[in-house]
């Protein structure tokens, strides 16, 4: 085993010495120059990478990079450039006549002519010309355009020119008169007019034309609905505060406002007491017991169950007899009618139709004598409809100033801003402020049916609260 291990180790060390490039000290070591170079497949990507890292590949890359640099900087290879491009004849300095100092104006003009640095950065520094030859199949309709050019060349030899050329020549021969731009003295002063009035002077040229044509050609604006011209509420936007809300009110005005605020507070207190009375728990004597609850649940069930069986018992035998024994009328219908019976039925039917027609004619004749009564009934009906219409109109006018219910909540009037008699001061510096402008504007919008009343969103927990007892606490607890 030891010998085998030492042999393997010797092979591995000799291989590493050979790969390192140094001459080994072992007798089995080989000169790196005489070592055979390892070759591999060159048609695979692995071979391409190895070839690029070898000296020949690096030399080729450097040569190609040098060629590209010469093409970018000088426009071609320096070895192929002529002598005039590489050398010049020195005939002396050209700055002899420029010994004079430049003035500030000259310096400024030179600075203005000098291009900006940002423009120089964006300029193309490469001298390699852009490719101009485009293949024919890359141009859309190339064959068609080529045939067109050949056709126009043929027509040009015959003296016929394209339409665009003929139009250009006609414009040159007959130039149009240039219109002078109107100056401020040439403009006609137009009087002011109401933009929203019905007699708009801009609409006068469209008067008398077809409305459908004007709408389709977009020369006539869309007609605004009449409801957009009416306000949602006739209430004023800004309400004047009552006289009692002044910082220095009279005694009567202040007492009147205090009584109004007192009535509002009493009404609110009554509603709260009513709600509390309805939701209050009943007394011990009136509390519901288990027996009373069961009796209420069974209320009306026992009487209905006793009376339900009697009708069914009486109907059972009769229904069975009806199914067993057919009625005589049913037997008569099954028999075939004779010709005499059919003639009698037709005569009876014809007689009934004649009697009905005579009766209808008699009634129509009698209606002629009831014209006065019918007119009176129509007049009463029209008067009733007019009265209902007036009542609806009056109700609508009365509710015009009242807020409508636009959403889920009703409109609640704001509290009356009033100060007590003890809070009134004789100085504006010590006056206590009342109300809020932002809240007042929002309440005004709600009262004028412009926005719906809202309330603050209630907090609702999305998950259930879970109580967990910690293990450390559970172990310590006795």
Swiss-Prot record:
GO terms for cellular component: cytosol; fibrillar center; intracellular membrane-bounded organelle; nucleolus; nucleoplasm. Residues 1-10 have a biased composition (Gly residues). Keywords: Acetylation, Host-virus interaction, Nucleus, Phosphoprotein, Ribosome biogenesis. Residues 181-478 are annotated as: Mediates interaction with NF2. Its main location: nucleus. Ubiquitin-mediated proteasomal degradation is regulated by c-JUN. It is associated with relocalization to the nucleoplasm and decreased homooligomerization. Phosphorylated upon DNA damage probably by ATM and DNA-PK; may regulate NOP53 degradation. The keyword Nucleus applies. GO terms for molecular function: 5S rRNA binding; identical protein binding; p53 binding; RNA binding. Expressed at high levels in heart and pancreas, moderate levels in placenta, liver, skeletal muscle, and kidney, and low levels in brain and lung. Residues 333-342 have a biased composition (Basic and acidic residues). Induction: Down-regulated by nucleolar stress through ubiquitin-independent proteasomal degradation (at protein level). Up-regulated upon mitochondrial stress (at protein level). Expression of the protein might be regulated by DNA damage but results are not consistent. Residues 1-51, 303-344 are annotated as: Disordered. Transmembrane segments: none annotated. The keyword Transmembrane helix does not apply. Changing residue 289 to A: Decreased degradation in response to DNA damage. Decreased phosphorylation, degradation and increased interaction with RPL11 in response to DNA damage. The modification N-acetylalanine is found at residue 2. The modification Phosphoserine is found at residues 29, 93, 305. Residues 342-386 are annotated as: Mediates interaction with human herpesvirus 8 protein ORF16. Signal peptide: none annotated. Changing residue 233 to A: Decreased phosphorylation, degradation and increased interaction with RPL11 in response to DNA damage. Residues 347-395, 396-478 are annotated as: Nucleolar localization signal. Belongs to the NOP53 family. Nucleolar protein which is involved in the integration of the 5S RNP into the ribosomal large subunit during ribosome biogenesis. In ribosome biogenesis, may also play a role in rRNA transcription. Also functions as a nucleolar sensor that regulates the activation of p53/TP53 in response to ribosome biogenesis perturbation, DNA damage and other stress conditions. DNA damage or perturbation of ribosome biogenesis disrupt the interaction between NOP53 and RPL11 allowing RPL11 transport to the nucleoplasm where it can inhibit MDM2 and allow p53/TP53 activation. This is Ribosome biogenesis protein NOP53. The lineage of its organism: Eukaryota, Metazoa, Chordata, Craniata, Vertebrata.
